């Protein structure tokens, strides 16, 4: 690249002073020069903003008047930023010095690439992939998501097996590169999600708009693992169950949704019965509420106009089977055991 495109590194913060202290020095030390760093603050109650003013006066702060969550928080902040590329970065991500340049170079050489992510590795087990996105996300025919290097709670060691630039279905919101023009065309994240699945929905719509989503094997970052208690919390599972159904409803053509959505509701019911039989009553209750709230959402949005729907059967990065069957019944724990090229 003779002239580096204007790139905005944008962190969404809520009471994350500790992570800002840890990770901003790494971000500032990246070898990409034409960048500006922004922090969108979701009405933090700690002294994050005071810390930024004191220790990082060069960082641009955008303050939201309340905690808007991931989707609306980013939408509000990014609407105020002028750049050619947005890098959406979690505050708990440690970046490497050269994580930007390979991705931007790749996207500049192919204008059809709308969204990209680096490899996302574990911060504590640095040679293993991490839950948030591994080496790029896939989806199966029923809408279950998984990633190269991470199938449910099984993580692969990074031995170079995903060092290629590969088409994926979704890029992780923990570290996502997106053309600013595309983000505006897509009107940003869908705010009804609040959190979880907003990046999968965004990437699905990018495909429907004629763009591709790529994992760049020449770049990597390190993500702090979610606390195990939070990972299994009833509220988190509520959003995962509900938002997956909303995502499918929004993006599937009618011909596909008439089969897939009832099948998913039935499979979710099986999960709820499993939770009950094992005494996980709070998780079962929240999961059941997710199904009910999805149906309420679907009824309230029955006349909404969703354009450019795209079938799951038409993408190279869709597994044409059930990943839950491969994983739980056949015992396949690695991406290469499930997806054959």
Q: Where are each of the predicted segments found?
A:
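Short beta-strand/loop segment that forms part of the nucleotide-sugar
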Residues: 34-43, 62-64
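Short aromatic/hydrophobic "clamp" motif used to bind/position activated sugar donors
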Residues: 86
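Glycine-rich, basic loop-to-helix element that forms the pyrophosphate-binding segment
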Residues: 63-81, 91-93, 102
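Active-site-adjacent helix/loop segment of glycosyltransferases
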Residues: 10, 213-323, 327-328
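Acidic helix N-cap motif at the loop->helix transition within catalytic regions
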Residues: 21, 46-54
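A short, conserved alpha-helix in the catalytic core of glycosyltransferases
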Residues: 162-220
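Conserved donor NDP-sugar-binding/catalytic core segment of glycosyltransferases
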Residues: 94-133, 137-144
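Short, acidic, metal-binding catalytic loop of nucleotide-sugar glycosyltransferases
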Residues: 25-34
